[in-house]
UniProtKB/Swiss-Prot annotation:
Primary gene name: rpsO
Subunit structure, as described in the record: Part of the 30S ribosomal subunit. Forms a bridge to the 50S subunit in the 70S ribosome, contacting the 23S rRNA.
Classification lineage: Bacteria, Pseudomonadati, Elusimicrobiota, Elusimicrobia, Elusimicrobiales
SUPFAM superfamilies: S15/NS1 RNA-binding domain
InterPro entries recorded: Ribosomal_uS15 (IPR000589), Ribosomal_uS15_bac-type (IPR005290), uS15_NS1_RNA-bd_sf (IPR009068)
Species name: Elusimicrobium minutum (strain Pei191)
Name of this chain's protein: Small ribosomal subunit protein uS15
Example GO biological process: translation
Family label: Belongs to the universal ribosomal protein uS15 family.
Keyword set, alphabetical order: Ribonucleoprotein, Ribosomal protein, RNA-binding, rRNA-binding
Length: 89
């Protein structure tokens, strides 16, 4: 699933450090989290979609790596992101 332009702008607006910030770890984690939420719902409706399941696993791993990096580099931003996205630490 591709997020619509408006959805992406809304998500980025919450986590951007500046107007031009589109690739910071916080923004990436927020966008990946939205894709994970969509795929989770899709897999509940389509349990035999193994390619989708693999994609979900890859996204979860990517988000985990980004969160680990963010935790090392900027712990305050990490706690803010995990709290706003309701992610476990």
């Amino acid at each position: 699933m591709v997020l619509s332009v408006n959805d992406r702008k809304e998500i980025m607006g919450k986590f951007q450090a500046s107007a031009a910030d589109t690739g910071s770890p916080a923004v990436q984690v927020a966008l990946i989290t939205e894709r994970i939420k969509y795929l989770s719902g899709h897999l509940k409706a389509n349990p035999k979609d193994f390619a989708g399941e693999r994609g979900l696993t890859k996204l979860v791993g990517q988000r985990k790596r980004l969160l680990s990096y963010l935790k090392k580099k900027d712990f305050a931003k990490y706690t803010q992101v995990t709290k706003e996205l309701n992610l476990r630490k």
